[in-house]
């Protein structure tokens, strides 16, 4: 059983991962902030490698009662460093993305604590991380999109489309993906994909306020409420990414042979 003093201690994994800043309140609200060198986050090979490992650390730390996900500055995750992900046209490179990609989104979905996303601006890379949260609070400057997949020439099989399909609806998700469209926080609110839209400066404080309120409930209530809330999306991701990541890898391999279409 964790005590208040235990919760106030900083576990070693808090400083283990270069792209993720972690802080935790005395009541067990863990805030995970994506960043790159202290500024807005550019998703890269290191983050891809570390994210599933960080989530495993979070899952096994009983001091974590609520997770708040957020970005740095005026964007959640708006950029990606493609070359740092390795040569995805080769089997071993694709396998790394397959293993890490599946584990990252699945471990997030299977985390047995409530998740609140504090979306602090544009999210054009891995928006599924935010949208599968139990509560999504977005700034009025937020725009959601999927930058990498079709721009790179690969099928969106890594879980993003599964989450979009669940929270946006199948036909809307397909249209947005095909057209490489985007949608604002207000549109997401009207579609039911976002719970609250607030000014940028209020996003994280509002998320942490809500998280603090939730910690007043019994821990087991919060824990198993999260399991209940995400059991459907967890099943969908387990099924969808198993074949989806393989098909994404196939389209990535095809990039080495442009003459074949």
Name each model-derived stretch:
Residues 134-157, 194-206:
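Gly/Pro- and small hydrophobic-enriched strand-loop and loop-to-helix capping segments
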Residues 102-151, 182:
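Glycine-rich beta-to-alpha active-site loop
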Residues 161-171:
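Hydrophobic, secondary-structure "cap" segments at the distal end of domains
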């Amino acid at each position: 059983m964790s005590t208040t003093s235990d919760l106030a201690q900083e576990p070693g994994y808090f400083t283990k991962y270069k792209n993720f800043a972690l802080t935790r309140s005395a009541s067990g609200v863990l805030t995970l902030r994506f960043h790159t060198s202290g500024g807005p986050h550019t998703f890269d090979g290191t983050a891809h490698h570390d994210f599933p490992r960080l989530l495993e650390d979070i899952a096994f730390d009983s001091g974590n009662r609520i997770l708040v996900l957020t970005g740095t500055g005026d964007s959640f995750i708006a950029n990606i460093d493609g070359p740092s992900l390795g040569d995805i046209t080769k089997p071993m490179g694709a396998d790394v993305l397959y293993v890490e990609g599946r584990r990252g989104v699945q471990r997030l979905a299977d985390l047995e604590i409530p998740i609140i996303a504090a979306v602090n601006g544009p999210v054009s890379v891995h928006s599924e991380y935010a949208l599968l949260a139990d509560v999504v609070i977005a700034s009025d400057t937020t725009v959601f999109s999927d930058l990498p997949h079709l721009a790179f020439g690969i099928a969106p099989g890594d879980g993003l489309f599964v989450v979009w399909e669940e929270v946006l609806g199948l036909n809307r998700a397909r249209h947005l993906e095909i057209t490489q469209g985007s949608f604002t926080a207000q549109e997401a609110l009207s579609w039911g994909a976002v719970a609250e839209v607030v000014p940028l400066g209020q996003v994280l404080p509002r998320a942490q306020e809500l998280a603090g309120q939730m910690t007043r409930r019994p821990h087991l209530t919060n824990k198993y409420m999260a399991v209940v809330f995400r059991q459907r999306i967890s099943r969908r991701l387990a099924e969808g990414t198993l074949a989806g990541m393989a098909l994404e890898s196939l389209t990535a391999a095809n990039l080495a042979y442009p003459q074949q279409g």
